[in-house]
Amino acid sequence: MAETYLTLTNKVIARLNEVELTSANFTSARGIQVQCQNAINEAIRYINQREYNYPFNHATAAQTLTAGTVKYSVPASTKVVDYNTFRLVKDSDLGNGSVTLSPLNYNEYLKSYVEQEDEIETTTLSQSHTDSVTTLTVASTTGFSSTGTVYVGNEVMTYTAVGSSTTLTGVTRAVSSTTAAAHASGVQVAQFDDGGIPKYVTRTLDNNYILYPFPTKSYSLKFDYFTFPADLAAHGDTTTIPDRFAAVIVDGATA
C-alpha cells in the first residue's frame, strides 16, 4: 500500500511514543502531532531540494503554440527544464514534421533575433465568431495596418479596412490554404510578416522560454522537465518519492 501523509506522520509519531492520528481526526491534530505533520513536509522538501533531476519528479509538458506569440511560461511546479528536449509534434494538417529545437543562448538571441518581437501586433477577439462572419470585433485595432493579413488560431484571414477602433472589416476567411473555423471570445488575433516553424528555444532570465522564429500556426510543443512537488495536505496525499525511501523521510522528520 502506498505511503500517505497519514501513514508517514504516524511513523514519526510512533518513534516519539505519542498518540497516532486517524483519517477522521487528521485535520484536528494538536501539539506534537502537528509538529510531526510539519516535519514530514520539511523532510520531503529537503530531499527534493538536494537534487534537480530525481527521476520520480520527471514530467513532460505539452504546449499548444499561438501564432504570433514569442514567449511562453513553464508549468508552475517546474524546478528545472531540460532545454535539449524541446520538440514539435508531427502534425500533417499543419504541415510540420517532428522537429527537435536547438537551445539558443539568451544573449545570442538578443544580439541576433530579438527584432522579431517588434514585428508583431496582437489583440484578442472581444466576442465569439462563426466560421463565416466577415467582420472581426476585437479589443483594439491599434497598431494594425489599414489593410492586411491576420492570424486567428490556425486560420489566416485578410481584411480590407479598419472599420473602427474595435473592428476589422471586409474579411476574407480561410486564405493561404487554411480552414475557416469558429473562434471563441478572447482568442488572440495577430498580425506579422515573418515567423515560421520554430527552430530555436531560449531560456529567459525569469526561467520561461522564447521561440525563434515565432510560430505562425498552433503547433504542438513538448519538453521534459523536473517538478518541485507541492506539500502534502490531506491525510491521503502521497509523495512522489518512492515508498522504499519512506524510512529516509521519517529519519529526516525525526532528525
Residue ranges: model-predicted function:
Residues 1-122, 189-255:
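Glycine-enriched, solvent-exposed interface loops adjoining structured elements
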Residues 54-58, 62-63, 67, 99-104, ...:
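Autoprocessing Asn-cyclization modules and mimics
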